[in-house]
């Protein structure tokens, strides 16, 4: 997300990241029920961490995000069209790591921009990832997300297998592209590392 933000900023865009903080106990309980449902279908999935465990694990990442990225006000529930209007957004970009994997999202429809379907904005998926080459959506999710995907102005995916998943299950064409982390140069990452203390040689 940081890499794509930097690329878009260099193209002259103002970039906001929708800050979706999903780790509250209600969402975790909902996730646990969905994991149980997947297990009943024979899928090999694990229970997620509790909100406290997840927050502790992500603390270093959160510090990076707060320092280097421009965030909207955080939400623990679904975004709404009011969020888009508040920040005067004229385009929404979805991506990348496993954003289209239902078991990793409170409501995968939001990653197909359901909350903004009534708005006149550009919709783009850059390097969106299913995280697997198997289709994990329910029939209801497939039907609704296929309709939402058809509203996108452009769709690209991170994995080659995602091209086939989009065609076979969502009925849309997708392009296979680089992971956004590869859009930057080594010098860009060197700037981020300059304040990291270096270990002394043995």
What are these regions (language model features)?
Residues 2-147:
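Aromatic- and Gly/Pro-rich donor/ligand-binding loops
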Residues 89-90, 156, 176-177:
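Nucleotide-activated sugar donor-binding and catalytic core shared by glycosyltransferases
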Residues 99, 161-162:
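Alpha-helix capping/helix-boundary segments
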Residues 119, 151, 169-173:
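Short, structured coil segments at secondary-structure junctions
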Residues 134-138, 182-196:
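Acidic anion/phosphate-binding donor-loop and adjacent secondary structure
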Residues 152-159:
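A short beta-strand/loop micro-motif in the catalytic core of glycosyltransferases
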Residues 163-181:
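Helix-loop-beta element that forms the nucleotide-linked donor phosphate-binding surface
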Residues 197-202:
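Conserved donor-binding/catalytic core segment of Leloir-type glycosyltransferases
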């Amino acid at each position: 997300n940081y890499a794509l933000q930097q690329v878009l900023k260099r193209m002259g865009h103002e970039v906001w990241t929708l800050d979706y903080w999903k780790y509250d106990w209600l969402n975790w309980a909902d996730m646990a029920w969905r994991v149980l449902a997947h297990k009943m279908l024979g899928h090999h999935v694990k229970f997620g961490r509790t909100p406290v465990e997840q927050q502790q694990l992500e603390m270093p990442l959160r510090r990076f995000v707060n320092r280097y990225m421009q965030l909207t006000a955080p939400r623990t529930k679904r975004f709404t069209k009011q969020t888009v209007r508040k920040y005067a957004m004229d385009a929404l970009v979805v991506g990348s790591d496993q954003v289209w994997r239902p078991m990793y999202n409170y409501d995968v429809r939001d990653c197909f921009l359901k909350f903004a379907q009534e708005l006149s904005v550009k919709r783009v998926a850059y390097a969106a990832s299913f995280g697997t080459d198997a289709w994990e959506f329910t029939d209801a999710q497939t039907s609704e997300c296929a309709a939402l995907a058809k509203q996108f102005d452009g769709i690209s995916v991170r994995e080659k297998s995602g091209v086939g998943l989009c065609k076979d299950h969502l009925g849309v064409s997708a392009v296979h592209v680089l992971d956004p982390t590869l859009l930057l140069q080594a010098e860009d990452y060197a700037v981020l590392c300059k304040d990291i203390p270096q270990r002394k040689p043995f």
